[in-house]
């Protein structure tokens, strides 16, 4: 029987995975279960650092805010940094293990010292990074809204959840078969899964497609 894999990303966002599945005769259902919309915002205070937890936070932030020469930019990991570079944004702090935000947050706190940080974010942000800093150093700014999409997904042998929000959207009208393998994109998604009473079979530390493909090879 042909293996069927679900990932909560659109095919256009995971070309290397699509190619791997074609090569290995794997049926891939690539479907993001969330969508985004801009939220109007104003920034009343000065800041020294802007931290981006995803490319979306950067995209929506720079729709309203100009890049500033006196501001330092930082982000959660290499994938986000690569996409920010396409917007002309170079980051001085880039997390090494995007799948382990708690670890990166501790490193980020040491790097920030006493500077003020703005955190462009979604309305559903977990605020992992801003919560570890003193309140007087933090500007939490909602710049976009995350909307969950209810969509029925065919039963699969392998499920790959790329964010807590995608997991929540999936579970609104779907169930994970008891014998399916579950791969999650980092600790935050793993923790959300645990709250639902489900244990992940694999947790991606770096949360990138090279790591994911190696895991899929080990399963098959």
Located regions from the model:
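Signature of uroporphyrinogen-III synthase
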Residues: 1-220
């Amino acid at each position: 029987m042909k293996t069927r894999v679900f990932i909560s990303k659109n095919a256009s966002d995971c070309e290397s995975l699509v190619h791997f599945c074609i090569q290995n005769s794997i049926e891939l259902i690539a479907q993001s279960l969330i969508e985004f919309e801009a939220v109007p915002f104003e920034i009343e205070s000065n800041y020294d650092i802007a931290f981006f937890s995803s490319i979306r936070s950067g995209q929506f932030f720079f729709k309203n805010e100009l890049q500033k020469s006196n501001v330092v930019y930082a982000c959660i990991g290499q994938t986000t940094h690569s996409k920010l570079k396409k917007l002309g944004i170079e980051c001085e702090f880039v997390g090494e293990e995007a799948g382990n935000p708690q670890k990166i947050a501790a490193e980020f706190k040491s790097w920030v010292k006493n500077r003020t940080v703005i955190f462009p974010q979604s309305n559903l942000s977990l605020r992992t990074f801003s919560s570890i800093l003193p309140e007087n150093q933090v500007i939490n700014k909602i710049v976009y809204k995350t909307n969950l999409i209810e969509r029925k997904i065919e039963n699969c042998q392998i499920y790959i959840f790329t964010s807590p929000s995608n997991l929540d959207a999936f579970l609104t009208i779907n169930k994970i078969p008891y014998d399916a393998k579950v791969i999650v994109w980092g600790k935050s998604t793993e923790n959300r899964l645990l709250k639902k009473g489900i244990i992940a079979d694999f947790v991606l530390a770096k949360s990138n497609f090279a790591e994911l493909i190696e895991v899929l090879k080990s399963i098959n």
